[in-house]
Amino acid sequence: MLNVKTKLGWDKIKGITVIADQDIKRGDYVTIFDPDYDLIFEKTYIDHMPEAQRHYVQNMTYEYEFGVGYRYILPFGQEPDMNHDPNPNVDEYGKASRNIQSGEELTCDYVLMDSRCVVGAEPWLV
């Protein structure tokens, strides 16, 4: 889930964007995992969902390997709306990689955040 104040924006090319609604310092946690809000799904659970729900969950989750197999995290709030950037201002650990000004779009690198993404491919644009 997002750990900073944000608002949604709109870009003609990207569509929905997540905009910082406060100044964020380099190294601050922009996103965090909170088990009270964020949901974790087992792959077998998702595989048995009806097609419409499975499609939604697969498109809105991040896949992580937890050492005992893959788990899918569905973050609470606007985090799934963050757009990809090969030079993101939020790193794969959820920290600001540089100072971010209020009004600036928050971006992440899908390849580093989701094990389903591979360098040179764009599976998130399905």
Q: What residue ranges belong to the model's regions?
A:
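Conserved catalytic SET/PR domain of SAM-dependent protein methyltransferases, capturing the structural core
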Residues: M1-V126
